[in-house]
Amino acid sequence: MIGSEIHNFAKELWPINRSITGEGVRETIELIKRHLPNLTVNSVPTGTKVFDWTVPKEWSVKGAYILTPSGEKICDFTENNLHLLGYSIPFDGKINLEELKQHLYT
């Protein structure tokens, strides 16, 4: 029974876009707290220095995809959040395939 519960929990967590900061992390923590109600969570504001690191700004994505020359939408972030590298910078424009390949990771 516990194996199926863990699997169902993982399926619930999978579609949430998580980074090291942001709404996805907060949503994930709330789901975890359903199973660990005594979990203590501390928040640290953006810009806080932590040893040799600074807490970054939240990274929020509304949508991301690639359109083929025929207009077909591929690599759609709404279908799989792994289609976008975390902390990617916004881009809106047309580039050729060779230039696109310089920005793809497989």
Task: For every predicted segment, state its role.
Residues 1-106:
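N-terminal hydrophobic/helix-forming segments and targeting peptides
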